[in-house]
């Protein structure tokens, strides 16, 4: 019990200061919670892993929310391209794309498209420091025009003339296998120190719809390559090439993995850790040493595979 007035005043002053400190600490803690915008509009083919039904989030969203709960960030999901024109867009620490096609068109899923200004706002934001994570079909997005139905333009190296989105991302999807569409291949771990890959033994056998890609930015830091030696089909008649990488786009941290087609892969620890490490790096929660290693990790990266032969009827 506090008896004298002076002691009571000192006690109350200490309580007030302590209370203010706790309130400030609480506000700072809340302010430190970073948010990731999951954007899954499909102007082209709509993948099963991003399909939603009323009250049921997509496979990708479920995995990302699980990672968010473990790692202390938040996730908001949308298929509405108008988000990039809104003030809300600028509140995110990173965006996560699993998308297809020209997102400035309504396209397959009929959700509101991005505007041309919204696309530019995205690119400007990443250059200014927004994190960007792309999975699988994020490289099947904003193909360098024209993009005819026979995909012939995808077999041409456009280099600096590639679409600005693809330059930001670091590479472009050409095609994937047909028969078989899925193959188990050896994934070579080029950077076992990148977040999420600690303790992983290389190579890793992984079943996937493997994207064959081109127009790699030469400044990418290759994290994973796929070994094509045992793979079958025209898309893989090429040397090993990058399937997961990181790069800086101005001040923005960009991470991409070509994997993620199969629903079951979004539950496999190896892949979940790859995605989680990429997100945590993109939002700045962990660091990584980036080296421009594409010429060492994949010396034949620039080889473009042969086109599929015409289908006979």
Regions found by a protein language model. Name each.
Residues 2-19:
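N-terminal secretory signal peptides and thylakoid transit peptides that target proteins
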Residues 4-6, 38, 46-142:
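Helical hinge/lid and interdomain linker segments adjacent to catalytic or ligand-binding clefts
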Residues 5, 26-45:
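C-terminal segment of N-terminal export signals and the immediately downstream linker at the start
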Residues 28, 167, 171-250:
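Catalytic beta-strand/loop cores that center a nucleophilic Ser/Cys/Thr
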Residues 40, 60, 66-70, 230-313:
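Extracellular ligand-binding/catalytic regions of CAZymes and related secreted enzymes
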Residues 43-44, 82-83, 101-103, 139-141, ...:
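Short, solvent-exposed loop/turn segments at secondary-structure junctions
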Residues 102-198:
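A glycine-rich, often tryptophan-bearing local segment used as a flexible ligand/cofactor-contacting loop or short
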């Amino acid at each position: 019990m506090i008896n004298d007035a002076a002691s009571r005043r000192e006690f109350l002053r200490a309580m007030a200061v302590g209370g203010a400190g706790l309130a400030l600490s609480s506000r700072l803690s809340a302010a430190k919670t970073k948010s990731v915008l999951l954007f899954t509009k499909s102007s082209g083919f709509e993948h099963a892993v991003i399909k939603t039904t009323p009250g049921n989030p997509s496979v990708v969203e479920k995995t990302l929310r699980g990672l968010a709960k473990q790692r202390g960030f938040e996730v908001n999901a949308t298929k509405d391209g108008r988000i990039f024109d809104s003030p809300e867009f600028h509140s995110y620490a990173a965006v996560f794309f699993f998308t297809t096609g020209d997102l400035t068109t309504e396209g397959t899923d009929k959700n509101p498209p991005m505007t041309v200004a919204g696309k530019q706002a995205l690119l400007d934001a990443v250059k200014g420091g927004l994190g960007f994570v792309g999975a699988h079909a994020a490289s099947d997005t904003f193909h360098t025009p024209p993009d005819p139905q026979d995909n012939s333009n995808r077999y041409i190296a456009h280099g600096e003339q590639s679409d600005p989105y693809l330059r930001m991302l670091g590479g472009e999807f050409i095609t994937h296998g047909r028969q078989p569409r899925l193959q188990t291949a050896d994934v070579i771990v080029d950077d076992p120190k990148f977040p999420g890959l600690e303790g992983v033994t290389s190579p890793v056998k992984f079943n996937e719809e493997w994207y064959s890609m081109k127009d790699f930015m030469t400044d990418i830091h290759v994290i994973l390559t796929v070994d094509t030696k045992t793979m079958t089909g025209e898309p893989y008649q090429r040397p090993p090439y990058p399937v997961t990488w990181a790069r800086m786009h101005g001040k923005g941290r960009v991470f991409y993995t070509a994997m993620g087609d199969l629903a079951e892969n979004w539950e496999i620890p190896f892949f979940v850790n790859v995605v989680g490490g990429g997100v945590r790096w993109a939002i700045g929660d962990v660091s990584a040493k980036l080296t421009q290693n594409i010429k060492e990790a994949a010396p034949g990266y620039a080889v473009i595979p042969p086109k599929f032969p015409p289908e006979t009827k």
